[in-house]
């Protein structure tokens, strides 16, 4: 009996030790597997987002090209360029802006009737001044008031400067008055081939984030560095776009992460 006890106790101890060792090994493997799955998911979502941005950028640039050489657009630009386009309150720029709104209204309305929202088409005066944001009734906000002016974009819109300088279309993501948007830009030229300005089409990040939110329990949010708020006037409502950690602004999503 004593011999059996002496044999069984060491075997039991060894078995217990092996069991505990196996438990920790298996637990570690599960943790590593979980970490790997999370990493794979993040990388897959990042790749999916990059592909969606590239696709939306290309579509935006193609749409901008469609509205870059219309005769009525050239007429509106010639009206604006006859005055002082560096004056944000220029009467000739305002007249040209109203010409753009009137001549392109049927196209804007037709798009909205089919798609459910107005296309975000933005014409610029050279080198980088807003001419007409065709999805808005007025151009931009100063404080709490909407104003109809040719606001200056030179300090935060390098893509507009680039297109007006080099005359070549481009696309990508850039901060504007509404925050981060996917953009496609094209030069505006007259029938004689002379460059008059530029035009861009904006695509909301909402379309990209909706695709990323398709998985169960998965939520994608978009944040912007708070330093860009001085330009992104459309994100200055702290109830809709709260500041996080004093450094970031919620652009798309909700406070609850939904």
List the predicted regions and their residue ranges:
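A short, hydrophobic secondary-structure junction motif
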Residues: 96-113, 160-162, 250-258
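Juxtamembrane extracytoplasmic/periplasmic/luminal helical "stalk" adjacent to the first N-terminal
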Residues: 3-94, 113-118, 168-172, 184, ...
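Intrinsic low-complexity, intrinsically disordered coil/linker regions enriched in small/polar
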Residues: 83, 206-258
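Extracytoplasmic/periplasmic, Sec-exported soluble proteins
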Residues: 52, 56, 96-100, 151, ...
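Short amphipathic alpha-helical segments
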Residues: 39, 43, 50, 61, ...
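Extracytoplasmic/periplasmic ligand-binding sensor regions of membrane-associated signaling proteins
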Residues: 105, 109-202, 210-212
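Short, solvent-exposed loop/turn and secondary-structure capping segments
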Residues: 76-79, 133-136, 233-234
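Short, flexible/disordered intra-domain loops and linkers
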Residues: 84-96, 139-149
